[in-house]
Amino acid sequence: MLYVGGVSFFALLAVFPAVALIIAFFKVVLNTGVGLEQAEALIEVVPHAARGLFQSEVERLIEAPFHKISAQSAVALIVGAYAAHRGFKAVLAGLTFIHDETDQHGFFRFNLLAFIVAICAFVLMTVVSGAVLTIRLMHETQETETLEGLGLDSEWMWAFAGLVIGLTLLYRFAMAHSKRVPWRASIGGGVGAAILLALASWACAVYVDQVVELGATYGSVGAVVVFLIWLSWNVNAVFFGGALATEIEIALHEYRRANDFAEAESEADLSLSEPRHFW
């Protein structure tokens, strides 16, 4: 729970600077409309009760003049980088604890690894949201015949694929120190975690919309509480994927060891069954 709380807190601290950076980037490189659609594509993954937090912030940033956006982006970059770095440090610490790593990284190496993972996660998030936006634009222009033929016209399929790829790489390269986690274990953990993330998002939406009325208890901060609940459930899913990858790795190791033992016994029996000649 300590790791889940740390990741959730720093994710909450980093998400608004990330939205500001995305909008500023598209304002400079492309246009405001694309930036708005990109931000809305990201907002749709959170429960409906928490979307108001982001929608009001996105509308404010879209309407703000360029010089204010530039100044806010500089501050957002500093705050977001700090929060993302600390959040991914908590993720890596939790995963290494789950994997039962005894050989810990040094201070510099651990911080560098967390920084690299944060950069890769931000790039992957931008690519996936861009793919989702592209699919939407193609649906609007009725140009999805090729993708429909290949079964690639669903935006949720691209989001799920991005989750699987990102989590698989996380478990493969960042969870173990002494050696890499096998690909089969990493992929199994990535697929399992991605499925759990989808289920957790759906269950959280049902919980906060139909089971409890958080607004009556928490008032104006109810949306923040909803977002924290959603974050904590999804972080638990990521850690469960790490545990699943670890168990698959152990099972693969035991299977290989049993096969090696059986082969050794077979060779020993074969050598004993060979006729011996005494001269």
Each PLM stretch: what is its role?
Residues 1-279:
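Membrane-embedded alpha-helices and immediately adjacent juxtamembrane helical segments
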